[in-house]
């Protein structure tokens, strides 16, 4: 769980995540999200988790409320030099567990078809494709959902 002292790490990881994409996140009001961290990812309805490896912020994931019993996983990102160590799976597992503790019944996420490694991770965690639940103007978005009960 992120502390106020970790917000600079979170901001940097979020910026690296955005830069790694072939899209502009302006449709998600990404700049405002950065300016207001933790924003909707703050307690009691959300969380940001940062993973450290050898003292360095290696990755992150965030959770926010969509509806009464529905949450959304956002910003799952692991720095390239830390990939292949299970950090992404550990982050996803931790945020899923926290969502259950908060009392959410389901978790959603949106991703891109081109993010094949991330999509394989989500499927291995039990996510299945679902109907669109948010605006995503990108080519080939994928919407997924996981039952938490």
Predicted regions and their residues:
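Alpha-helical macromolecular-interaction surfaces
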Residues: 86, 90, 94, 116-117
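Conserved G/P- and acidic residue-centered "switch" motifs that form tight phosphate/ATP-binding loops
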Residues: 55, 86-88, 103
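Acetyl-CoA-dependent GNAT
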Residues: 1-74, 79-80, 92-94, 98, ...
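Active-site acidic-Proline motif in GNAT/NAT acetyltransferases
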Residues: 79-85, 113-114
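C-terminal "cap" of GNAT-fold acetyltransferases
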Residues: 105-108, 112-149
């Amino acid at each position: 769980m992120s502390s106020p002292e970790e917000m600079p790490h979170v901001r940097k990881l979020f910026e690296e995540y955005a830069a790694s994409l072939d899209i502009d996140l302006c449709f998600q009001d990404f700049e405002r999200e950065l300016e207001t961290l933790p924003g909707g990812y703050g307690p009691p309805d959300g969380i940001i988790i940062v993973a450290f490896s050898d003292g360095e912020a290696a990755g992150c994931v965030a959770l926010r409320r969509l509806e009464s019993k529905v949450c959304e996983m956002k910003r799952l990102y692991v720095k390239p030099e830390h990939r292949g160590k299970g950090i992404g799976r550990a982050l996803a597992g931790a945020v899923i567990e926290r969502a259950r503790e908060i009392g959410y019944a389901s978790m959603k996420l949106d991703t891109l078809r081109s993010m094949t490694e991330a999509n394989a991770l989500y499927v291995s965690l039990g996510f299945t494709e679902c109907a669109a639940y948010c605006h995503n103007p990108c080519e080939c978005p994928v919407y997924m959902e996981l039952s938490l009960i």
